[in-house]
Amino acid sequence: MPPRKRIGDIMLEHGFITEDQLQLALVEQKKTGELLGSVLFGLGFISQKNLFKVLSATQQDDRSAPAKEDSGLDVPEEIDYLVQQSSAIFQKTTDLHKAELDSPHSPLVNLVEKILINGIRRGATDVHINPDMKGVRIRYRVDGVLHHGMFLPGKLLNPIVSRIKVMGRMNIAETRLPQDGSAEFFYKNRGLDLRISSFPVIGGENIVIRILDKSQVLVGLESLGFLEEDIESIAESLALPYGMILVTGPTGSGKTTSLYSFLSMINSVNRNMFTIEDPVEYHLPLARQAQVNVKAGLTFATGLRSILRQDPDVILVGEMRDSETAELAVRAALTGHLVFSTLHTNDAVSSIVRLTDIGIDPFLVSSTIDTIVAQRLARILCVHCKEPLPADNPAYQAAAADPAVHTLYRSIGCRACDNSGFKGRTVIYEILKVNRRIRELINKRASIDDILQAAIDNGFHGMNVIGMKKVLLGITTLEEVRSLARSAN
């Protein structure tokens, strides 16, 4: 069977682009990981019409031929199919508004499904559908970083948005106001929850879809990246009959995953466990889980009040968003319950001050909080392409690493990691254990610096220490840890 023609070659043969334009596009493609056709279209080197001609030609080739890793010209099979689908739909745009927005046989439904499946395959947590001056830009957030997916013709924006709104049970006629919706999506016998947000911007409506896989298996703390000695410290806190354990960090830092891993360590038939969340991200056996429904009047505060009448042993409050919820959670911890929750603070010590700043009595804070874990997620170097740094690289001196003992690495990029150089993430964290001295300082409304010094005297170290350990182990890069340390400070 003859080798499949590459898209770049076909474009050159037809005179649609020049060799110089192709080389420029390949350089850009290596930076972004984008489809070659999308790069050429985005740079203005090829028109939509000519791009679709090339895609039609590639469709006639053998689709089973594998792409060569070093060519830089072949399009991955599932992406190629998605682009060809968009081409077919674009040719039928006059019929798009006549098509049923929820018909399984509609080409529009098929296109939206392919966009979602592509994100799921890439391990995306979010799918972004953005109006762009040149068309519709599809992007995927993978390992915390947005990656280009593809460009679609601008005429497809409104039909795609309408289809997604139908899925999310949103008002397709309302385009002037932001809306939120949710949908269930099945892929390979897995039920996924989609959280949909629309926002009107210049050029149309911007759509972001959060992908939640409730069926994913909870992993242990070691798999998340916690070190053995710190797992033992956390286990000691989990053995307490009452008190409060907090996990803090920005959105997307893995707080919920860590909390559920904590809960799974103590989940048993002998404990009555409740959660109130927005949304419920994991299913936990034996736990009674509730989801916030503001429209129906079920908030974190009202849910927590009712849970306290259900004879709970362990309570997870997804987030302490306001003073009412925070005070209820703190009082629950004071009255014989083990309470878990999250806060949006940059570091562990700041969480203490945040609670007192929103009006919680320092005595209640000092009497209930036992452990605070602040965390970030660092990208893991791709094992297939990471490259050792030479011994004279300045990174060794910056990391205080001896090249004879440790090997530092840099990211390169390959097909296995979608040319990003990273695959997966590991937790970078700090653990604050609230001892007697820190409790005294909380009661005195001491400053963050005073509490931090007391914590250091008790063996506390910042998350940069854990980060540097993982650099020396070859798990991540010095640049990645430095970036996270800056955000923590």
Predicted regions, residues:
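Non-catalytic accessory regions
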Residues: 1-91, 477
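Short, flexible helix-loop junctions that flank or precede catalytic/ligand sites
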Residues: 18, 96-118, 122-489
